[in-house]
Amino acid sequence: MRCRREFIKIFGSAAVLSSARIATPLFTGSESDQGNALRARLASDPLRPQYHLLPAKNWMNDPNGPIYWKGFYHMFFQYNPGAAVWGDMHWAHAVSPDMIHWRHLPLALAPSPDGADADGCFTGSAVDDHGTATIIYTGVKTSAPEEATLRDGVHTFREVQCLATSSDVELRTWAKCKQPILQPPNDPRLTGFRDPFLWREGNIWYLGIGAGFRKEGGCVLLYRSRDLRQWQYLHPLATGKWTGHESVNPVDSGEMWECPDFFPLGTKHVLLYSTAGSVIWEVGELDSKELIFHVQKRGILDHGAYYAQKTQLDSHGNRILWGWIPEKRPEAEFSAAGWAGCVSLPRLLSIGVDGDLEMRVASVANSLRAKTFVLPQHHVAVSERGSTLKAIHFDNVCGELAWKTKAAASTFKLEDRAGTWWSLHCELQGSTTKLNVNGVSVDSPATSKAEREFHLFLDASVAELICDRKHAITTRIYRKPDGPLRLVLDDSNLAQITSLQAWQLRAISSDRLTS
């Protein structure tokens, strides 16, 4: 799996560094005819998602600072206003009444030419500081190699933590503190210092930052403060292990943790982070006196095209997970397309009876359902390829499928006239079930449950699958279906299906969020 730093290394030299100012719209009123033509082309691009959040154009990556504020959900995300490749990181901004239906607002944060964030406003978090909306984010600026904390073979960035506040209801305008609120440790072994997250206990704020040390491993550095501006370093909240392999990018070798997040869930605490090609979840206990996290269970958050995880509380106090769905096609293709990346659907997190982290797409996504397809099991035609259920035509490939099966081994395909478009193959191997989704292979321990549960969301080139609320596999499909999609199952599996439902889903805008 390609990590975020690899995107920086590959695309950084091609990035367009602009001097865009805060509150610049994604499309400006002075745009040329060429720009209007781009908007029209993006609005009709069959590979561009229709109900996932994404910018009007160009590149996006990490979701940043999701927050429920004054009755609305605000999502910020890493954005390049100048091109559909990584570079010149700003904070784009969108707002929603329900975490599903989004509209774009002006850019929230832009690099300050003479500031500590001159080369980018990187990932961060948003919190309510006694009635004041406050963002803490990582600012980066090119520096001498000996002062840099991010070294990827292309850049030598010094990473510091910066703060900005907003006083308007829609969080349209932000005022930055003139100076960084936190400098990195003076340690030559440091592999990074970015992606802050926060929580509060009483009058004390705690700040965690993704970091690591060469030939030791990634970690979360823990700080505390009473005012979000003066910080005291405590110790690592959690630490990992180096893989033992040398790498130019310390994320690849487990020597750096990106995008950490930490929060209570039920009676446990959960730590999320990305390192060594995986997005990791850990469930355990927080020692409230020593402020050290002790891991009890560990797993993979999503096995596919998913990175830069971020959580928030919804209006009911539920823990909601977001992630960046990156492109899986060559740079030349998505650069020419004029857009890259989107935000995942909101996933509701919980702790299972076995102590594992569980997830499902939040029920607010039900508002997308426009039509229910009737799929009785007797509507089956036997073919050489297996049992074919009644064909489903998802307009613009906006659809949802949910099914349950008693079969330990099974195959579930979506086919068009050209062949297999999306497939899931489950094979029992001893005490393990091997799941294969469009070439992505996942090992799933055998379950004592009488049936397995699958939930699939299709949106143009995006497919989000969750199995048994434990295994998420997000994939990209860069081929428009040739005609209606047919559901194809093994003959032996058909009788084992206990439930099968399908819905046509609505687009959340008339122009694929290009305005």
Regions flagged by a language model, labelled:
Residues 1-2:
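Secretory targeting signals
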Residues 6-28:
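N-terminal export signals
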Residues 26-195, 200-252, 257-259, 264-303, ...:
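Beta-rich carbohydrate-recognition and catalytic domains
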Residues 122, 194, 258, 307, ...:
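Short beta-strand or tight-loop elements
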Residues 287-291, 296-304, 312-515:
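Beta-rich accessory regions
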